[in-house]
Amino acid sequence: MKSFSRILFLVFLLAGLRSKAAPSAPLPLGCGFPDMAHPSETSPLKGASENSKRDRLNPEFPGTPYPEPSKLPHTVSLETFPLDFTEPLNPDLRETPHPESPETPKADSLTTSISESLDMPKTNLSKMAHPESSETPTPGPTEMPHPGSPETPKPNFSKTSRPEFPETPNTDLMQTTPQESPEILQLNATEVSQAELPETSNTNPTKTPDPKSPEKHDLNSTETPNSEFLQALHPDPSKTPHPESHVTHNPSPTEISQTEFPTTYYQNATDVPRTSDPQISTSLYPETPVPFKDDATALNELSLNPKPGTPAAIQPDSPKLPTSDSPGMVELKAPQNSGPKESNVPPPSARIAGPPALPGRPSQLAPATLRAPQRHSRGEGVNTIIVVERVKETGVTLVGRPRGAAGGALCLFFAGTALLIGIFVLLWCLYRRAARQRPFAHHRLPDDGDEPVLHLDAPKDPYDLYFYAPDTWVPSHIATKQPPPTPPLPPKLPPPPRGGRPQRLEALSPATLPNNFV
C-alpha cells in the first residue's frame, strides 16, 4: 500500500518536481552547503547532499531541515539520477515538509523520489550498487558523489543508497527519522554518521568493511533494502530501507547514504548495513553483492582518500550511521553535526578520522583528571589513616577503661566478699568470747530452777560430786562454806511475881487513855 502510494506521489511529484528539481537541488546545496557544502570539498553535489542530509537530518536548521534534506537527497540523486530522481526527491522533499513531519510528506516525497529512484536506481542499481559499494571509492564517482568522493560517494549513494534509501532511506529516513523526531534526523543524520562513524568510521575508516559495505551497504543500496527497510524499519511503504538507514539515512538519505556510505561505507560501508539491518543487508547484498563489494572496496579507498573532501559527509555520515544503533549517540552528536555544518568539512572529517579517538582521548584525559582527584583522595586517605590511628588510640584508652572498670568491679567484689567474711569471723569470735565468759549460761541445774545456793543448806558428802560436780571449776568457798549459825533465842521473861496482886488490865479506850497518849 505504502509503496503504491509512494509511487503515485512520485508520479505526481515528478510532474511538478522535475521542473523544481534543478532549483531544489541548488537550494539544498545553498542551504545545506553553507554548512556542509564546504565540508564536501570533493564535489558540491556531495557537499549539497551532505548538507541537505545534515539539514534534513538536523531539524536544528529549520530553514533547511527537511526540505533541504529532501532537496539534498535530490541533489545527490541529481548526480546519480539526473532529473527524475532529483525532481521527485526535491519536489517531494520540498512538498513533504521534512521539518513538519518527515513522516508522511517525506515518506511521500521520498516515496515518489524513491519510486523514481527505485525505477531509475533500479535501472542504475548495478551502477548504484557499484557506486554505492564504492560509495566513496572510485566506482561511481559521478553517480555516487559522496562525501567520500565528490560524485561517486554521493550520487552513487543517492542512487544506490537513495534509490534504495530514497524509497526506504529517504522515505524511511525522512519519515522514520522525522517520525522519530527532527532531533533524531539531525542527531541521527549527524550522529548516525558520527556515532557509528566513531564506531565504524574511526574503527573502520579504512576498514569500511569493504566486503561488508558491499554486502550490507550494497544491499542497503539495492532495492531489496528498500523493501526490507520499508518493512523492517518502518511500516511506511519504503521506509524500512534500513533500520539504521531509516535512522541514518533518514537523517540524511543522501548524506547517510552519501556521507554515511562515503565515510561509513568506505569506513563503515558494512557498518551502515550492519547497523541498519542484517536482513536488509542480506536482501540488498543478493541484489548487487559483488559489484558493491568491488565498488565498496574502491569507494572505501576513495573515501579514505577524499576524507578531507568528504569530511562533512563523513561526519554527518558518522553521526547518522549510529542513529538507529545508538539514538543517544545521535543526539549527543547532533551538535557535532551542526558544528560540521557550520565548520563544514574539516571538523567532520577530523571527527570522522579522529572523533572516536578524540572521545577516547577525552576519556583518557578524564581518567587523568580523575586520577589527580584520586591522588588527592589518597592524600586524604593518609589523613584518614591518621584519624584511624587516633581512633585506635582512643580505642585503646576506651578498652583500658572498660578493663579498669572490670578490674574495679572485681576488686569491689572481692573486697565486699572479704568484708563479709571478716564480719562473720568477728561475730564468731565475739560469740566464743562471750561463751567463755558465761560458762554456765548454757547449762541447766538438775533441780530445774533451784538455785545452787538453796541446796547448800543440807550438808552433803564432800566427795559426793554427783550433784555438785560442776562442769567448770567452782570456787571452794562456795562449796565448803556452811551457812551461819542461827542466833540464840532471846532470854525469856521473868516469871510473874507470885504473891502480889495480879496485874490489872486496863481497857484501851480513848477515855481511858491519858491525855498525852499519842
UniProtKB/Swiss-Prot annotation:
Segments of skewed composition (Pro residues): 138-153, 482-499
UniProt membrane topology term: Single-pass type I membrane protein
Signal sequence extent: 1-19
Assigned GO CC terms: Golgi membrane
Glycosylation sites: 124, 156, 188, 220, 268
One record GO biological process: non-motile cilium assembly
Keywords of this entry: Glycoprotein, Golgi apparatus, Membrane, Olfaction, Sensory transduction, Signal, Transmembrane, Transmembrane helix
Record-annotated membrane-spanning stretches: 410-430
Bias type Polar residues, positions: 168-180, 187-207, 248-270, 276-285
Reported function: Required for proper function of the olfactory system. May be involved in establishing the acuity of olfactory sensory signaling.
Protein name: Golgi-associated olfactory signaling regulator
Source species: Homo sapiens
Taxonomy of the source species: Eukaryota, Metazoa, Chordata, Craniata, Vertebrata
Gene symbol of the encoding locus: GFY
